[in-house]
């Protein structure tokens, strides 16, 4: 019997570590999804570097107490799955929101963003943000704009001087 207790303690420690290490965590109710749909969701999340796991609610509540996120205890009723992302803050919210639009059975319950409990509204707002790559490309275009404008002005001045000398 003690080996079962030790195994449960290891699982609680694993869950707590995942909550600590992840930049973004989203909790969903997956009740009503069939195996093919869950497999498709797992595939999309895995491609984005997001880990999607199902744990017993009692073990998850103990891990939440260990991490200091007891405010999420009310969320853990019924079948739940947790999406952990160590890299991209936006990825789990974006993928799960897009999937929930196509599959009404998937319900986003709450989340944790960089150690702070996030409401459903905050998760939805996060899902509407562009991806990290999209934000970087926007930043790059903003940084390139002055240089591009300077180059165009310099070319226009050179063309004008060329016309005057001709």
From Swiss-Prot:
GO CC aspect terms: large ribosomal subunit
Biological process terms in GO annotation: translation
Alphabetic keyword roster: Ribonucleoprotein, Ribosomal protein, RNA-binding, rRNA-binding
InterPro entries registered for this protein in UniProt: Ribosomal_uL10, Ribosomal_uL10-like_sf, Ribosomal_uL10_bac, Ribosomal_uL10_bac_type, Ribosomal_uL10_CS_bac
Gene Ontology molecular function terms on file: large ribosomal subunit rRNA binding; structural constituent of ribosome
Pfam families from the UniProt entry: Ribosomal_L10
Keyword Ribonucleoprotein among UniProt keywords: yes
Highest taxon of the lineage: Bacteria
PANTHER family recorded: 39S RIBOSOMAL PROTEIN L10, MITOCHONDRIAL (PTHR11560)
Function description: Forms part of the ribosomal stalk, playing a central role in the interaction of the ribosome with GTP-bound translation factors.
Record text on subunit structure and interactions: Part of the ribosomal stalk of the 50S ribosomal subunit. The N-terminus interacts with L11 and the large rRNA to form the base of the stalk. The C-terminus forms an elongated spine to which L12 dimers bind in a sequential fashion forming a multimeric L10(L12)X complex.
Family assignment from sequence similarity: Belongs to the universal ribosomal protein uL10 family.
Protein name, UniProt field: Large ribosomal subunit protein uL10
Organism annotation: Geobacillus sp. (strain WCH70)
């Amino acid at each position: 019997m003690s080996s079962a207790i030790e195994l449960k303690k290891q699982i609680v420690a694993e869950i707590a570590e995942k909550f600590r290490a992840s930049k973004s965590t989203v909790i969903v109710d997956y009740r009503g999804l069939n195996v093919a749909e869950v497999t498709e969701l797992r595939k999309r999340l895995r491609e984005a570097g997001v880990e999607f796991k199902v744990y017993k609610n009692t073990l998850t509540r103990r891990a939440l107490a260990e991490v200091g996120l007891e405010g999420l205890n009310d969320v853990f009723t019924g079948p739940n799955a947790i999406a952990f992302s160590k890299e991209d803050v936006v990825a789990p919210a974006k993928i799960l929101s897009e999937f929930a639009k196509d599959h009404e059975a998937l319900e986003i319950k709450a989340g944790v963003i960089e150690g702070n409990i996030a409401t459903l509204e905050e998760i939805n707002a996060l899902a509407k943000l562009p991806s990290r790559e999209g934000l970087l490309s926007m930043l790059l275009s903003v940084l390139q704009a002055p240089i591009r404008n300077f180059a165009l002005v310099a070319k226009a001045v050179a063309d004008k001087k060329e016309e005057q000398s001709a």
